[in-house]
């Protein structure tokens, strides 16, 4: 029995080598991080420890843009425009529903557990940056503006964002004072890839290609092959994930400051957020999946383990996108046309973990300041957290989102810096939650559109055509029918008839297997010539 169990474990490790190595890298990173803290390593040493992880993250982020272009266009180009619209509407509706449910769950848990303790306010907490003029309307308008970039090339490295600039009047008042400072809204560009705008562009591009039909077949084939090449490259790069994840986690732990004074309060805060994220992942989302599909959600969890661990290690949904696609298609059986559309869109707007985290963080800060939020303010927090999680999902660490919600309900922003000490952990957990949510979304969308996908395959199935062509080539290569070449007697007979007819065009086609256009009934199947052709030495070659 023990020998069989050991053999099963060895077999599992062999079949899931990358998964085992990735999980071990997370454990190793935590052990090294806490084990090396007493050594008080220098900044140069910390920089060297973080260096492999930084390179790994840069390589993964490098693949985001070509992966989105190739996967989205290749998937939508093989679908009908009506089916693409239904898929997009279903996906967005699901993401909005789960974000609202996550926000409600977070507000409920933080109200019941009550992790905020006003007695620790005596602790010296550094001031956090403030952007008090940003409103939910600005966030929503920025979201829409970024959906339609004026320059698709610029969208690969910049996105639009509303800021408020303080302007001092140039003309002094009559009493000699300079007057009040005027705050003016400014719409500018900030660094960062505008993924939402790129997704909108690729979606339209792919739908137009699908409408062109056979005329755009060569373009479809190009993007399908490009997608396969990029995915093969990504699979190769993922073998460097264990080293990168170990260095990232170890470096983050070594850079933490001493948090012993507020450890108990922060521990309860972390417990509240993690409890909400876990409940949302194992109860809310699976229940929605079961009610819609009537299928067991456990295979989705099992198939996405590798992607979830990678998301926890990298703390980046975009960097995990290639691994998510591979797990969803290979282990969960989701159609690539669905996964290549839903996952890139989900990495931008599906931020259930962020919505829950932001709602808990805002009410936690209110509890620290002994502020009792009214029902209207709680509703404001829930709505703003949902909008901010979608519109500002790509902002690192959720800083702007939390500041936005705090200013909406009039809470102080100085306590946000306290949350940074544990945000490295919560960021990884909520990223894993978002990745799993994307997987369930893709599975549910496939269930809803399965009949339409089958109908599309029946109308025009590239895979079946390609398979048929391959089988035809195989049958030709294995055919026992002998190949022929023209004998000397046949050549002489052919030249005699050609000279008699005086047709120079026929003379230029000596050796052709096509039938002549004259009265000469000479072809490779002519049985009147004895023997017209002789077999080649190797009759197996085509």
From Swiss-Prot:
The chain crosses the membrane at residues 16-36, 55-75, 93-113, 192-212, 234-254, 265-285, 303-323, 386-406. InterPro entries: DAACS, Na-dicarboxylate_symporter, Na-dicarboxylate_symporter_CS, Na:dicarbo_symporter_sf. PROSITE patterns: NA_DICARBOXYL_SYMP_1, NA_DICARBOXYL_SYMP_2. It is found in: Membrane. Keywords: Glycoprotein, Membrane, Symport, Transmembrane, Transmembrane helix, Transport. Residues 505-517 have a biased composition (Low complexity). Glycans are attached at residue 175. Pfam families: SDF. GO terms for cellular component: plasma membrane. Residues 518-529 have a biased composition (Polar residues). Belongs to the dicarboxylate/amino acid:cation symporter (DAACS) (TC 2.A.23) family. This is Putative sodium-dependent excitatory amino acid transporter glt-6. It comes from Caenorhabditis elegans.
